[in-house]
Amino acid sequence: MAFEARIAKGPGVEAVFAARADLIERAISEALARGCSGIISFGTAGGLAPDLKPGTVIIASVVSGPLGKIETDPEWSARLFDAFAGTPVSGRAVRGRMAGVAAPLTGEREKSALYRSTGALAVDMESHIAGAIAAARGLPFAVCRAIVDPAWRSLPRAATAGLRDDGTTTVLPILRELLRQPSQLGALLRLAGDARVARTSLVQARHAIWG
C-alpha cells in the first residue's frame, strides 16, 4: 500500500506497491529492469498466530501460498532480524512462516483455519508474488511485515472498501459503507488504532534496517 512504500523508500531503496496481483508483478518487474540487488517484501500483515499482538514484526523464513512454498534468503533474513538488536523493535520481532493469499482474509474463522493448516504467523497478499519473482530471477528475497489486525479480530467491510487496485485508498467508499451499516464504526476505529501501532513498528524497523 502507498503508506508502506512511503515508509520504506529512501537512498538505495526503491519502493513499489499495488493491491492487484498483476499490477504488483508489473511494478516489481519494472523496478528490476532498473536494477536491484534483491527484494524485500515490507509492509503490514494480518495476524494468524493467536499470541501475536498488533505491531509485532515478522521476519519470514518461508512464505506458503498460491504459488507454493518460497524460502527466504537465510543471510538477508538474519541480517534484518539482527538489525533490531538494541532498538525498540527487538522485543516485538519474531521469525517464522508467512502465508500468502490472493484475496483479503478478513474473518476470525478464516484466519484460524489458515493458521491451523499452515502454522503461519501472519498473512499478506504480496509476499508470495514478490518471492516468486525473486526466485525466478535468482535474487535474494526477504520479508519484513508488521501485524495490523490480530488473529482474534475480524475486519469490517468498511476496512477494505476504499482500497484501489493501485494500492492507494479513497474515503468515499468507506463513508458509503459506514452509512449502509453504522455499526461498523467501532471495529473500524479499533482497526485504526491497530494500524497506528503497526505503522510505528514499521517506521522503527525501517530505521533499524537502513538507518
Give residue ranges: language-model regions.
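Glycine-rich phosphate- or other oxyanion-binding loops that anchor nucleotides, phosphorylated ligands
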Residues: 1-211
